[in-house]
Amino acid sequence: WTDVKDAMEIYNFNGKHYEIVNSVSAEAVVIYNKQTISEQGLDDPWELYQAGEWNWDTFEKMLEQYCDPDADQWGLDGFWAEKALFLSAGVPSVQSVDGRLKTNLNDATVEKAMNFGYDLYNKGLVMDRSLFDWNEQPQFMGEGKELFYICGAFAVQSNPDTWNTKIPVENLGLAPVPSPEGSDPYQGATLDGWVLCKGAANPEGVALFADCTRLANTNDEAIAIADQKMKDDYQWTEELIAINKEINDLARQYPVVDLATGVSTDVASLTTDGGDQIGLRAAYHGVEWATNREEISDVVDMLVQEVDDQLAALA
């Protein structure tokens, strides 16, 4: 359980842990077309990562070099992109600190992340989805008309004929979501696990079952079976499998989860799920953060404090 200990702390409230985390994976990855990268004379993102040079700056420079809407060359796409890049700075809007809920809307790192998104928008590096009935256009990736598509790896974990990106399997590229230069490589994380309900009739059975699921994620034979499935069903190469594992390892080492959605739908609607005009996605659609923050921070602080008080009362 050692490598999921940090992830378990994310759901630590008042000194009690509320999720038995059996695995951690990256919530999103950067998907790219190797052929597009090569034809444009750009550096391969995975190779930049290996060289320690994959960060917000190199990500932005590549978008600047590629983007040309007049030539039907679009930059950043994906409904997951805004949240993924926000979390890659390392500070979510709501988190548990020493067992208590804390809001971070006035944190300098959050401001930095929002300003980064606003800058990408102002430079025309974020695909204008209003031109496409407000839909993402992942198929542009396979057509060489889009540089980066940020989504969960699940988008390319099926028969390649079903991939919405339409990237030929031999040209599929994956990289972690970049973080600020000089920062740890934080990744938005998916925590797979179990919750033991109060009054459960067989808590020892739950513990044993959790051990079994943990074993399935760490046993060499089980991992080999999963790897073979990726080769057979997804046509992934050994290299792609290794890259995906390394990205998930980053999520285990540097996991970031925003608790806003779990606090309440009201908090989520003002932060992670706020849409294009308010909250954490709005900067990527031209909404300046200082104004946005002023509108939501007091209300979010109040709503989160109410829930934190309720958790404290339960303890």
Report the location of each language-model feature.
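Short, solvent-exposed loop/beta-turn-alpha elements that line the ligand-binding surface or hinge
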Residues: W1-T2, L48-A51, P92-K112, N164-K166, ...
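Extracytoplasmic/periplasmic solute-binding protein
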Residues: E9-V30, S38, N55-K102
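Short helix-loop capping/hinge motifs at secondary-structure junctions, enriched
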Residues: T36-D44, G199-V206
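Short helix-initiation/N-cap motifs at beta->coil->alpha
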Residues: G52-T58, D128-E143
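Glycine-centered hinge/linker elements that transmit conformational signals in sensory
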Residues: E60-L63, D98-L131
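Alpha-to-beta junction loops
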Residues: D72, G142-G152
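Extracytoplasmic/periplasmic substrate-recognition and gating elements
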Residues: W163-Y234
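Conserved C-terminal helix/tail region of periplasmic/extracytoplasmic solute-binding proteins
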Residues: K198, P203-E204, N217-A315
